Amino acid sequence: IKGGRVAKFAMNDKCAAGTGRFLEIMADRLGISQQQMAVLALSGEPTKISSMCTVFAESEVISLIGRGEPRENIARGVIDSVVSRVATMAGQATGAPYYLTGGLCENAYVVERLAALLGSPVTTSPQARFAGAIGAAIRAQALN
C-alpha cells in the first residue's frame, strides 16, 4: 500500500480453486462447516489434494472419504492446497506487507498457514470478505 492505495494486487479470477467458495464446497463434502474444517485441520496430517480444479478436487475428496481417510487429514490437505495456490499468487507481488481479502479471510487457519508459507504477516479485517462489493460501491458513488 502506497499513499493509501493498493500498489500490487493479485486475484484468482480463473476458477474457484483458490477461493473461499472452494473451501465451502469441500467443507460441504466433508459434512462440516468451514469453521469446523479449520478446527479439524489443526489436528490433521495433510493428505495431498492433487487436483487444481474444484470439480476434480471434490471427486478426490469424496474418494478419500470413501477410502476411510481421516477427515482432519482431508481438511488439512484441502486448506494446504488453497494456501499453496494463494501463496503462489501472492509471491508474484514480492515483499511484505500482505493483505488478504475475500472469503478466505474468515478462516483464521488459512490466514495463519499463509503467513507461515510467505514468511511474513498477513493482515485482514472483519469486513475483508466484502472488499470487492465495497470497492464497487465506492466506484459507483464516484461516478454519480
Where are these regions (language model features)?
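Residues forming the flavin
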Residues: 5, 9, 108, 135-140
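Acidic-glycine-rich active-site phosphate/pyrophosphate-binding loop
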Residues: 1-3, 52-59, 104-119
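Adenine-nucleotide phosphate-binding core of ATP-dependent small-molecule kinases
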Residues: 57-90, 129
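Histidine/lysine/aspartate-rich catalytic loop segments that bind and position anionic ligands
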Residues: 39-65
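Glycine-rich phosphate-binding/hydrolytic loop that grips phosphoryl groups
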Residues: 20-24, 28, 125-144
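Glycine-rich phosphate-binding loops at beta-strand->alpha-helix junctions
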Residues: 90-117, 128-132
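Glycine-rich phosphate-binding loop plus the immediately following alpha-helix
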Residues: 5-42, 46-49
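Active-site nucleophile and cofactor-binding loops and adjacent substrate-binding regions
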Residues: 10-18, 77-78, 99, 104, ...
